[in-house]
Amino acid sequence: MQQPRPIRRALLSVSDKAGIVEFAEALSQRGVELLSTGGTARLLADAGLPVTEVSDYTGFPEMMDGRVKTLHPKVHGGILGRRGQDDAIMGQHDIKPIDMVVVNLYPFAQTVARPNCSLEDAVENIDIGGPTMVRSAAKNHKDVAIVVKSSDYAAIITEMDNNDGSLQYTTRFDLAIKAFEHTAAYDSMIANYFGALVPAYHGDTEQPAGRFPRTLNLNYIKKQDMRYGENSHQQAAFYIEENVQEASVATAEQLQGKALSYNNIADTDAALECVKEFAEPACVIVKHANPCGVAIGDDILSAYERAYQTDPTSAFGGIIAFNRELDAATAQAIISRQFVEVIIAPSISQEARSLLAAKQNVRVLACGQWQQRIAALDFKRVNGGLLVQDRDLGMVSEGDLRVVSERQPTAQELRDALFCWKVAKFVKSNAIVYARDNMTIGIGAGQMSRVYSAKIAGIKAADEGLEVKGSAMASDAFFPFRDGIDAAAAVGISCVIQPGGSIRDDEVIAAANEHGIAMIFTDMRHFRH
């Protein structure tokens, strides 16, 4: 059985100095000798702590502008030396055991994320000594504790106090895992950065540098295990990025309710990303990753009421997302009207939380307010590979539109067209959305032919008794034939917004003119598979 190991000597060298003075002080108060380097050593000395510079300890100065500091046998021998096995050779060379290494690495990711970061800047932020010490300590975790996260400082001090200044083997093992994860993620970032530069450095002007590296290394942190995946025979877990910058389902705090399922998370993401498209108070109701009702209003209560009207049947057991704080009136309207799986909003008022507490099975998430949408990559696994593309942040404004029909859209038709175009972006292809007065009235999703999506949208509107005449229709991609326009005209659509680009555009435009429909081209497609 592995024994607890006392901490008598620690080497501290950190880039992120949050909490390091307090941690070092706590170690010193418990009799731990402190070794340190560079800026960390100066910080500790300025705080009045007894600290020995590594250069004084090794008798070898820092050199090459700090490139060589800790790469010395007295450092790595002290870390890698096996207690009880290498003691004689360590004594022969005056190598003292180092029982704890506290290191985090140069901020490479933050450096290369800066606009106009040069290759020289990137290179100078590649840590060499840090990862070497981290790996050495993690390798010898039987005898050495390696600390790479400031969030572990408090727990380490508590355990030392409970174990006469020692750390248990299980703790050292867990810390070693974090250390290997830390260096793996760090090396992955460097490999991705340099891999993305390959085309430019080989004279390939067709492939933009900085987007798609030669090899792609992904690092995600497990947030939770799940009872099962999309289906009950599939195991699943939820992994998140380490430093998520945009409010999302990954950052959301669950305030109540059962654990989120795989499908809950997928559907909640779809709802939240859709509602982010709107500046006005908006509500999106999602079922099976497709919006089934979307509306904007003077406030979120009116937005919810109108979104629900689109398809009350599908809204049952759905996911509801808002882009404003959830208030008590809206919470009451939801729980008195329907069964809901998840509600997500930037924040939840205390009054709304009190009301929702009576429905403990409802999962309630507060995700925080988003200031902007972050450009990132999207991934889709295929058997044996991974498709990678830019996240679809594209959206048109009124100035981007081209009216291609004889009739110009009215101001109201134009507003409705832009509204349902935003919704169509989040509907599975082939996608057709009918909208009127900033409210969806029919959604046709995921059909193999576009005309059937148009027909389904009309059927949905008719089933709910919603007036289609004078409404706008959005299509996520071009119409390959005129039949979709004929189907829209048959139910009273007066304005169509679509990307255009079909070899039969002239035929489709002619159909719009025959029916007196205003037709708008966006010149932007929003396939969603």
Swiss-Prot record:
One of its GO terms (molecular function) is IMP cyclohydrolase activity. Pathway: Purine metabolism; IMP biosynthesis via de novo pathway; 5-formamido-1-(5-phospho-D-ribosyl)imidazole-4-carboxamide from 5-amino-1-(5-phospho-D-ribosyl)imidazole-4-carboxamide (10-formyl THF route): step 1/1; Purine metabolism; IMP biosynthesis via de novo pathway; IMP from 5-formamido-1-(5-phospho-D-ribosyl)imidazole-4-carboxamide: step 1/1. The keyword Aminoacyl-tRNA synthetase does not apply. Residues 1-148 form the MGS-like domain. Keywords: Hydrolase, Multifunctional enzyme, Purine biosynthesis, Transferase. Gene3D superfamilies: 3.40.140.20, Methylglyoxal synthase-like domain. The keyword DNA-binding does not apply. It catalyses: (6R)-10-formyltetrahydrofolate + 5-amino-1-(5-phospho-beta-D-ribosyl)imidazole-4-carboxamide = 5-formamido-1-(5-phospho-D-ribosyl)imidazole-4-carboxamide + (6S)-5,6,7,8-tetrahydrofolate; IMP + H2O = 5-formamido-1-(5-phospho-D-ribosyl)imidazole-4-carboxamide. Its EC number is 2.1.2.3, 3.5.4.10. It comes from the Bacteria. One of its GO terms (biological process) is 'de novo' IMP biosynthetic process. Pfam families: AICARFT_IMPCHas (PF01808), MGS (PF02142). InterPro entries: AICAR_Tfase_dup_dom_sf, Cytidine_deaminase-like, MGS-like_dom, MGS-like_dom_sf, PurH-like. GO terms for cellular component: cytosol. HAMAP family: PurH. Belongs to the PurH family. The IMP cyclohydrolase activity resides in the N-terminal region. This is Bifunctional purine biosynthesis protein PurH. It comes from Serratia proteamaculans (strain 568).
